[in-house]
């Protein structure tokens, strides 16, 4: 667990070309530069909030997630691990975590395939923006129920 794969893999039915196992470290090194920029952006957003910058940050997190999927560094659990990483990046700027429900998986996979096969990130960005809003609404509803229980 936690070791990079030492074999080539593919995602059946997606058409997505994944990094050869020998290219995992070089590809991750390239992505590290973008991730370091994201971490600085998060700091700046927390120091000087701007909705436009927050949305740009969200979109950039999503693109990084797509690129990490194409590297596919582990033999198993890449999707869960990468979504967890994106959720951590969201948390760094106060955004809620997102969870993909079973009935949303097809839409998510179609958007991810469009991003990874055509470099068209619009659908996956839109999906994540919707999911962030969805998470905010769910959180507000949950806190209302907690308040009602607390005062009854």
Predicted regions, residues:
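FIC/Doc superfamily catalytic core
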Residues: 1-76, 80-152
